[in-house]
Design a protein with these regions (language model features):
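A short, Lys/Arg-rich alpha-helix, primarily the initiator
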Residues: 1-18
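Short, conserved glycine- and acidic-residue-centered signature motifs
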Residues: 6, 20, 51-54
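Small-residue (primarily alanine) positions within well-ordered alpha-helices
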Residues: 10, 28-31
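Short basic helix-loop element that most often maps to the first helix and adjoining turn
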Residues: 13-26, 87-88
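Residues in the recognition helix of alpha-helical DNA-binding motifs
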Residues: 16, 30, 41
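Recognition helix of helix-turn-helix/homeodomain-like DNA-binding domains
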Residues: 33-50
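DNA major-groove recognition helix of helix-turn-helix/homeodomain DNA-binding modules
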Residues: 52-69
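Short, charged recognition helix plus adjacent turn
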Residues: 67-103
Length: 103
């Protein structure tokens, strides 16, 4: 398992599950976890804190299904398309330039 085990956020979990087209029950089943456990993880604020064994099972299930979890500043080795959050300053600059283009 990867370092993402300790860094996965609730937002990453929800996005990964959406990319796979799974509902919470299906992900729980694949990971060998209970549905309430996955619900609690997704309802977390920020980085998921919980039982290391449960987090490990979850990350393993996601990675086995083809998900690549990226931490801050990480680069992707994948060839497919992806989505990630911009740095907060970069998002503001993009918004400002978009507003200028619309005038």
């Amino acid at each position: 398992m990867t370092q993402a085990l300790y860094l996965i956020s609730a937002a990453q979990l929800r996005a990964a599950r959406a990319l796979l087209g799974l509902d919470q029950r299906a992900l729980a089943e694949r990971a060998g976890l209970s549905h309430p456990t996955v619900q609690r993880m997704e309802a977390s604020d920020g980085v998921i804190r919980g039982n290391i064994d449960s987090l490990g099972k979850l990350v393993f299930a996601l990675e086995s299904a083809g998900i690549e979890l990226l931490g801050d500043g990480a680069t992707s080795s994948g060839l497919g398309r992806g989505v990630r959050m911009k740095e907060r300053g970069a998002a503001k600059a993009d918004t400002d330039s978009t507003l200028l283009l619309r005038r």
